[in-house]
Amino acid sequence: LIIDNNDLQFIEHSVQEKIRNDSIDIVFNIYEGKKDLVEKINITGNNVTNEDVIRGELIIDEGDPYINLQLEKSIAKIRARGIFKKVAYNVQDGSKNNLKIINIKVEEGATGEISAGAGIGTSGGTLVFALQENNWLGEGKVVAFEADIDEESFIGRLNYSNPNYNFLGNSINYFIENQSNDKPDLGYENSVL
């Protein structure tokens, strides 16, 4: 946290624990580490997902100081998107002593969902159908449709979500809902969009 808040670079640390009879001594050693830079970031395995979606989750970029903590946070953000089955990385030496090459390998996972349901009760039957795609056109966007139908009403919803709008970490969501009721026994019909 101190490193992130103060924008300190090339900082490394180690923790030493000394256990005694009735106490534990913990020593944090913080020191200036080797001044490595990121030469290149290679991304492989993304056959469906656009590379921009993955790079948009990276905290570390080419030309930045190589800080392992930032790399681990970046990998965690990629995994958190939920569109990859596996995310692995390795770091190798670059073209010079102080340069590092980061290789990120992803394995695409299933991103679509289909669900359906039916129910019968004393007031009639209901059908529900839903579709959702969590990586629409490989752009990391979420598109979902849901329909809820019974004897007297229809509810339809269309949702669109961009979880990393303009690569700023902000989410933007749109949805449209249509609800129609037809109750001939009560003498009215309405529709709401």
Show the residue positions of the predicted features:
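Acidic, glycine-rich low-complexity/disordered segments
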Residues: 1-93, 112, 168
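Gram-negative/organellar outer-membrane beta-barrel architecture
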Residues: 48, 67-193
